[in-house]
Structures are given as structure tokens and as C-alpha cells.
Design a protein with these regions (language model features):
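Core RecA-like ATPase module of SF1/SF2 helicases and allied nucleic-acid translocases
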Residues: 1-180
Length: 180
């Protein structure tokens, strides 16, 4: 399965302009509920057959950050729901029970950090003043360079100028010097 369009956000779970909220809205437009479409609810997330998803924690078969499509949701012999996911670049379908699905998230929208190392045909990037702390040149560069064909930036023009001109990066206190 090729990666066509992805929406990048700076923030995962705070406010209306975050990855989690965008995923819900995009899912409703691209893969709405239907009587013949199986679903699996895990905590507050509803997964449907056909959803684009991402692994969030390494396991035996799949690494953190890998994406795929839910190809099947069905019950096993004990009437427990199982979710089959076909990950990009893998031949086999990987099966998850409800507990394992806690390491899966919708992937219509992802953070810029999660996008590193991946490419997409089209990138849609919301840039809002509410992302002020994340408006940095290096993040804009990362987002733009993930696109193979097209970048669509949505938001206030001023936010692009802020990001382009904000070159300082946060100083990280890793204590690396003390550990060496």
C-alpha cells in the first residue's frame, strides 16, 4: 500500500488542532461507519476496516512508526474481536486482540516527529498560531521534505513567516557529558 496523503500536526493531543482530533474528523470523512463495515472500539478510539493506522510501540513483528491498513475485523472462536492489519511493505497480515490494539493509533494525521524517515505523495500541514511553541524552521523543513509531489499548508500566512524565521532550537538537558 503506497502512502499518498498525510496530514502533519505539531501537537498530538492538546486542543482542537491536534493529531487526535484531526484523525477523528478525517476518519469520519474518508472511512465513515456503515452497517456492513466492522468496527472495534479500544478505549476512546473506534477502528474500522479500511482505516489507516500506525504502530506506536515495537513488538515481535512490527516497529514503532510503521503504518498500514486494517484489512479485517472479525471474531475468533471465543467470540473475541481480532483486528487484521496489513503493514506497508509486509506480506503477512498481523492480527491484534483488543489489548494489543492499545499500541495502534489512527494515522490519517501524525506528528511531524513521527514522520521522520517516511515519504508521502502529498503532505497537508496545518499551521496555526496556537502551535506557536512548535513553529520552528527545522520542523517546517522536516514536514516539507516528507512530500514527494505536493505540500499544502493551511492556516495563517504569518505562521509560515514565524516558522521560517525561528531558527533556534530548544536546548536539551540530556546530561550526556556527565554520562560519558
Amino acid at each position: 500500500m503506497k502512502k499518498y496523503i498525510i496530514c502533519f500536526c505539531s501537537i498530538k493531543s492538546k486542543g482542537l488542532n491536534c493529531v487526535n482530533e484531526y484523525n477523528k474528523v478525517i476518519q469520519q470523512k474518508i472511512n465513515p461507519p456503515a452497517p456492513d463495515k466492522p468496527e472495534m472500539k479500544v478505549k476512546t478510539t473506534v477502528f474500522r476496516q479500511g482505516d489507516r493506522v500506525m504502530q506506536t510501540k515495537n513488538n515481535e513483528f512490527v516497529s514503532n512508526g510503521e503504518t498500514g491498513i486494517i484489512v479485517s475485523i472479525e471474531k475468533d472462536e471465543d467470540e473475541e474481536l481480532l483486528c487484521g492489519i496489513k503493514f506497508d511493505g509486509k506480506h503477512d497480515t498481523i492480527w491484534y486482540d483488543i489489548e494489543d490494539m492499545s499500541n495502534i493509533t489512527l494515522a490519517y494525521s501524525i506528528t511531524i516527529h513521527k514522520s521522520q524517515g517516511s515519504e508521502y505523495k502529498t503532505v497537508i500541514m496545518p499551521m496555526m498560531k496556537s502551535f506557536f511553541i512548535m513553529l520552528k524552521r527545522n520542523l517546517l523543513y522536516t514536514a516539507v521534505t516528507r512530500a514527494k509531489s505536493k505540500v499544502i499548508i493551511v492556516g495563517q500566512k504569518q505562521t509560515i513567516f514565524i516558522a521560517v524565521n525561528k531558527t533556534e532550537t530548544d536546548k536539551r538537558n540530556t546530561q550526556l557529558g556527565a554520562r560519558i
